[in-house]
């Protein structure tokens, strides 16, 4: 049963976001992830703490508007994405770039 719960939590966190701003936030022990748009803050916090074995002190989320896209004469939208910025407790860290 615990494995099913871990799998459900793993589906909440899609991928880490690596941008200039996200890299700057790493210096303040803040990590940025793309998450499921339907996930709530408690679910996101539980997923990060369970998957990475860290303590999340603060969590903020952003749900930016969808961008319109056009392919030829067909108009559409990009997929809805939600970003979460997690601030970790002092001494905790997540290895996003493993040593080669």
UniProtKB/Swiss-Prot annotation:
One of its GO terms (molecular function) is structural constituent of ribosome. The keyword Acyltransferase does not apply. Keywords: Ribonucleoprotein, Ribosomal protein, RNA-binding, rRNA-binding. One of its GO terms (biological process) is translation. GO terms for cellular component: ribonucleoprotein complex; ribosome. Gene3D superfamilies: 3.30.70.330. It comes from the Bacteria. InterPro entries: Nucleotide-bd_a/b_plait_sf, Ribosomal_uL23-like, Ribosomal_uL23/eL15/eS24_sf. Belongs to the universal ribosomal protein uL23 family. One of the early assembly proteins it binds 23S rRNA. One of the proteins that surrounds the polypeptide exit tunnel on the outside of the ribosome. Forms the main docking site for trigger factor binding to the ribosome. Part of the 50S ribosomal subunit. Contacts protein L29, and trigger factor when it is bound to the ribosome. This is Large ribosomal subunit protein uL23. It comes from Synechococcus elongatus (strain ATCC 33912 / PCC 7942 / FACHB-805). The lineage of its organism: Bacteria, Bacillati, Cyanobacteriota, Cyanophyceae, Synechococcales. The gene is rplW.
């Amino acid at each position: 049963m615990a494995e099913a719960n871990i799998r459900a939590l793993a589906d909440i966190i899609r991928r880490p976001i690596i941008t200039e701003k996200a890299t700057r936030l790493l210096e303040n022990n803040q990590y940025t992830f793309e998450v499921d748009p339907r996930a709530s803050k408690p679910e996101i916090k539980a997923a990060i703490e369970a998957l990475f074995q860290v303590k999340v002190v603060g969590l903020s989320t952003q749900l930016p508007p969808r961008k319109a896209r056009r392919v030829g004469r067909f108009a559409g939208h990009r997929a809805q994405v939600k970003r979460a910025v997690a601030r970790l407790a002092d001494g905790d860290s997540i290895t996003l770039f493993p040593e080669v």
